Regions:
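Active-site loop immediately N-terminal to the catalytic Tyr-X3-Lys motif
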Residues: 39-40, 81-82, 134
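Short, conserved glycine- and acidic-residue-centered signature motifs
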Residues: 47, 85, 180
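Structural signature of beta-strand start/N-cap positions in the alpha/beta core
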Residues: 7, 65-67, 138
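The catalytic Tyr-X3-Lys active-site helix of short-chain dehydrogenase/reductase
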Residues: 38-50, 88
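NAD(P)-dependent short-chain dehydrogenase/reductase
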Residues: 20-28, 53-131, 145-147, 154-161
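Conserved Rossmann-fold NAD(P)-dependent oxidoreductase catalytic core, especially the SDR/UDP-sugar
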Residues: 1-43
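Catalytic Tyr-X3-Lys loop
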Residues: 5, 46, 120
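C-terminal substrate-binding subdomain of Rossmann-fold SDR/epimerase-dehydratase oxidoreductases
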Residues: 98-227
């Protein structure tokens, strides 16, 4: 406001949605108006929720023109792909790229937990639509509504690779919520936007890039970005 900034974008997250709406793998409720009563399942989700409120308070009290998007698992080439901070698509691509024919790849939990994943190029398009909107500020979901199980995601990476691999489900205490999928009705209604790229196509591009990194014996590249 002091610098007379015309418009500000805040990248929120689907992690701000209440845990009780994400207990069923097949039927998560992540409509924008389902955020309250608040009950995110992590400190990260609470931080995103409170930050949304802070930006909206600046809008109400100071007239700051804000735009808020709730991202749903953005992925693609040049993203983080190793080290434990990568998203599931990159993790599966890396595990498959590192594996040899006949190997197993590990999937945490029973693999029946569901998620949706949005390719980075489409995320950029959604953000641009939101920033160019004269009066729609959100909060609004920017994500894919193509929901898959994590086992299916792993199978997809294996199919892309052409390798003969199997999946080993590993019991762990914490695997996150059981179901998460972007509800895109609001953004389609207000901005006419919806993702067009199929998950298999985004995974193919991502696998090809990560496979190159693995076969070049690289660690996390310096020019990668966390998405």
């Amino acid at each position: 406001r002091i610098r007379n900034t015309k418009r500000v974008f805040y990248s929120s997250s689907a992690c701000m949605y209440p845990e009780y709406n994400q207990l069923e793998p097949e039927n998560p409720n992540l409509k924008e108006d389902s955020a309250y009563p608040a009950q995110p399942d992590s400190e990260y989700g609470w931080e995103k929720l409170f930050s949304e409120r802070l930006y909206l308070a600046y809008h109400r009290n100071k007239g700051l023109d804000v735009r808020i998007a709730r991202f749903h698992n953005i992925f693609g080439p040049l993203g983080t792909w190793c080290g434990g901070r990568e998203k599931a698509p990159a993790s599966m691509c890396r595990k498959v790229a590192e594996a040899k024919d006949g190997d197993e790849i590990e999937v945490w939990g029973d693999g029946l937990q569901t998620r949706s994943f949005l390719y980075v190029d489409e995320c950029v398009e959604g953000v641009m639509r939101l920033m160019d909107s004269p009066d729609f500020r959100g909060p609004v979901n920017i994500g894919s509504d193509e929901m898959v199980t994590i086992n299916h995601l792993a199978e997809m990476a294996i199919k892309i690779s052409g390798k003969n691999l199997s999946i080993k489900n590993v019991h762990v205490k914490q695997i996150g919520v059981r179901g998460r999928n972007s509800d895109n009705k609001l953004i389609k209604q207000n901005l006419g936007w919806g993702p067009e790229m199929k998950l298999i196509d985004g995974m193919t591009k991502t696998y090809q890039w990560i496979n190159t990194q693995v076969n070049s014996n690289k660690t996390q590249p310096e020019n990668s970005i966390q998405i």
